[in-house]
């Protein structure tokens, strides 16, 4: 089998930096799918992405499809010919579909009779004849939310396309894609290297592009270079660069030939909280801040230029000039905000709606204040501090700093509260109320902050569900899924003794007559329990384990978690499968019983040895496990219940449950009812697969 490397590059206007990597990886994945569907062998698919190009390179691609042997079975011989031996219409129709006559068909004998069959060899097509359509299909499936048209073309893409290059080895694959004919022309850097040049062989990519066009097409190479040089620059300045991966990806997507440089700003700006300075450096300017070994911000930053002059001083000065007004703004906002106490912003919250039916932000802070106090009492936090933090929780939203730099909400509240002389736990809670902000984010550290964070999240959940605006489909404008999961994480990971139903009930009472959904408590609890499913599935816990616990609907998250861990452990035991099947059988038997199920076991009515053994063990375990269930030690309890496998199997092998004697029958049903209830103290294990 002969192979060649294949290159496909699409040259465009500047692509959206936050989407570049996703587009490139999707292009490669789509191309792999096309190749596999065509039955073409290849070694691997590499992807390349720069601000003005997307490319894939298929290594060791077979130059033709393999031949395929096909076999199409037709009607049975008995149905293919009539009494006179002439082909029936069914046989003729099948043969016509195969492109043959009935006489050309072969016959195959099976244990079900003799059948007509058509066997043929389909020759594979040359790969070069297939590639243009494959590339077009791969591009058409890219995740582009808002494609655009340009010039007088009718085609659409994420940005205007200027060049298309497709090479199989040294052969140009001709054809039009996105309104542009495939050619050997590559475009280089806008300001460095050659503007246009020719590529003669796929193997020259991407080295030729770097050599002649001053473009590093490999995204990961650019990213690694930026990271290494940034760390090197920061070390030279006696610090450590703050390089988040998302920002690094974005910066990598903005430059074709990265030149990493360091610049500085005036030390006077360090009097402003570092978070505000970092917000504008990272968010607006795409700079990397530098911290000293103690985590304090240094008056330096790192930026990445797309040009590489002999003297970079002008570029450095230019970036310093660009950032200075933004830092000056932050300084001004900070000094202006300090002229008022945080508490003085409370009246202004009355001018901002939280939600039309639910009132203003001032209404929300009043509810958070009360609910945070209630939660604090239950979890052992300082109630006074929790209520104070709840009262001040949204005041920083009215400050100049947060109005201009929105991502500093919370953290600026903390700084302003400290300046006002508020208790440190209160100040920190103003920042930590929003935690966790995203999946995997850290949780509030103190119990006071946890109380405020939970109060804020439950207020939003209860309010929005209370007016019937719960999430539908993928739409979630109030981020209720994130709020629910965040609340669950705080309760579970901090092992807080809170009941979802109780908190939602208290929260709903604080809304007065604003809520219109009479089932708000049940709806919010159901929604939050549903979030558990997503959480545990992400952890790799089996769906049937989660369903087994959900069937019992425990509303204390810490208790729910303990049950899931216990059932997951139990599921791996040797006895689990048999006991799950037995519980399913017990459930089916008891479901057919009319009226109230018998509750009390009478061992004197046990006529068979097997039922007496099981009855005695069930009674003994009820007494033994009651304190374990009360303490939530479910794993230990299930380990003990696993010992019932043998007596349960023996019972079903030797005892007729539905005995003719009504006393025997009722007693046997009581044994099974009590057996099932032991397991139901943890979960419905009959749902385990």
From Swiss-Prot:
Classify the source by domain of life.
Answer: Bacteria
A GO molecular function term, named singly, is: arginine-tRNA ligase activity
Q: Which residues form a coiled coil?
A: none
The record's listing under InterPro entries reads:
DALR_anticod-bd (IPR008909), Gly-tRNA-synth_bsu (IPR015944), Gly-tRNA-synth_heterodimer (IPR006194)
| EC id | 6.1.1.14
This enzyme catalyses: tRNA(Gly) + glycine + ATP = glycyl-tRNA(Gly) + AMP + diphosphate
PROSITE patterns recorded = AA_TRNA_LIGASE_II_GLYAB
Taken from the UniProt entry, a GO cellular component term is:
cytosol
What are the BP-aspect GO terms? Answer: arginyl-tRNA aminoacylation; glycyl-tRNA aminoacylation
Supply the enzyme class, top level.
Answer: ligase
Coarse class of the primary localization is cytoplasm
Q: What family is this protein classified in?
A: Belongs to the class-II aminoacyl-tRNA synthetase family.
**Record note on quaternary structure:** Tetramer of two alpha and two beta subunits.
Question: What protein name applies here?
Answer: Glycine--tRNA ligase beta subunit
Organism per entry: Pasteurella multocida (strain Pm70)
**Phylogenetic lineage:** Bacteria, Pseudomonadati, Pseudomonadota, Gammaproteobacteria, Pasteurellales
């Amino acid at each position: 089998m002969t192979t060649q490397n294949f290159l496909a590059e699409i040259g465009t206007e500047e692509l959206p930096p936050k989407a570049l990597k996703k587009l490139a990886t999707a292009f490669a994945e789509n191309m792999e799918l096309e190749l596999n569907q065509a039955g073409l062998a290849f070694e691997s698919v590499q992807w390349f992405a720069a601000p003005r190009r997307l490319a894939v390179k298929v290594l060791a691609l077979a130059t033709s499809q393999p031949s395929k042997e096909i076999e199409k079975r037709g009607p049975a011989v008995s149905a293919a010919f009539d009494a006179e031996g002439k082909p029936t219409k069914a046989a003729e129709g099948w043969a016509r579909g195969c492109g043959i006559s009935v006489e050309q068909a072969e016959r195959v004998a099976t244990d079900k009779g003799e059948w007509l069959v058509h066997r043929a060899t389909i020759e594979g097509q040359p790969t070069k004849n297939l590639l243009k359509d494959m590339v077009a299909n791969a591009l058409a499936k890219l995740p582009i939310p808002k494609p655009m048209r340009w010039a007088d073309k009718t085609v659409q893409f994420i940005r205007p396309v200027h060049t298309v290059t497709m090479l199989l080895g040294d052969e140009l694959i001709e054809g039009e894609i996105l309104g542009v004919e495939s050619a050997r022309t590559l475009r280089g850097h806008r300001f460095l290297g050659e503007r246009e040049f020719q590529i003669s062989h796929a193997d020259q990519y991407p080295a030729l592009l770097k050599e002649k066009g001053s473009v590093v097409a490999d995204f990961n190479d650019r990213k690694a270079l930026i990271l290494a040089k940034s760390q090197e620059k920061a070390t030279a300045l006696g610090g450590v660069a703050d390089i988040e991966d998302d920002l690094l990806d974005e910066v990598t997507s903005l430059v074709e030939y990265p030149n990493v440089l360091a610049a500085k700003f005036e030390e006077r700006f360090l009097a402003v909280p570092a978070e505000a300075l970092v917000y504008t450096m990272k968010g607006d300017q795409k700079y990397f801040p530098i911290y000293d070994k103690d985590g304090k911000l240094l008056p330096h930053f790192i930026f990445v230029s797309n040009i590489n002059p002999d003297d970079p001083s002008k570029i450095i000065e230019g970036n310093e000039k660009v950032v200075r007004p933004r830092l000056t703004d932050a300084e001004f906002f900070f000094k202006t905000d300090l002229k008022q106490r945080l508490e003085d912003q409370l009246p202004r919250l009355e001018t901002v709606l939280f939600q039309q039916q639910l009132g203003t932000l001032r209404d929300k802070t009043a509810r958070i204040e009360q609910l945070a106090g209630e939660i604090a009492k239950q979890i052992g936090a300082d109630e006074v501090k929790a209520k104070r933090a709840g009262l001040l929780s949204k005041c920083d939203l009215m400050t100049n700093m947060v109005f201009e730099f929105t991502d500093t909400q919370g953290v600026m509240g903390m700084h302003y509260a400290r300046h006002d002389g508020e208790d440190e736990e209160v100040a920190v809670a103003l920042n930590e109320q929003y935690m966790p902000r995203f999946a995997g984010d850290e949780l509030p550290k103190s119990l006071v902050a946890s109380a405020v964070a939970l109060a804020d999240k439950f207020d939003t959940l209860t309010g929005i569900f209370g007016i019937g605006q719960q999430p539908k489909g993928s739409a979630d404008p109030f981020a209720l899924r994130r709020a629910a999961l965040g609340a669950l994480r705080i309760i579970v990971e901090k092992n807080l003794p809170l009941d979802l139903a109780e908190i939602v009930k208290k929260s709903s009472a604080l809304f007065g007559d604003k809520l219109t959904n009479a089932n708000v408590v049940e709806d919010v609890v159901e929604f939050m329990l549903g979030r558990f499913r997503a959480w545990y599935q992400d952890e790799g816990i089996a769906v049937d384990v989660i369903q087994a616990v959900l069937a019992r609907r425990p509303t204390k998250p810490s208790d729910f978690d303990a049950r899931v861990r216990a059932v997951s452990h139990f599921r791996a035991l040797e006895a689990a499968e048999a006991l799950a099947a037995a519980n399913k059988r017990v459930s089916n038997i008891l479901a057919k019983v009319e009226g109230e199920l018998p509750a009390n076991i009478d061992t004197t009515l046990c006529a068979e040895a097997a039922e007496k053994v099981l009855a005695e063990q069930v009674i003994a375990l009820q007494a033994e496990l009651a304190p374990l269930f009360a303490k939530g030690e479910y794993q230990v309890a299930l380990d003990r219940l696993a010992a019932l496998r043998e007596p349960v199997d023996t019972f079903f092998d030797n005892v007729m449950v539905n005995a003719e004697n009504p006393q025997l029958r009722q007693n046997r049903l009581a044994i099974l009812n009590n057996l099932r209830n032991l397991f139901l103290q943890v979960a419905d294990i009959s749902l385990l697969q």
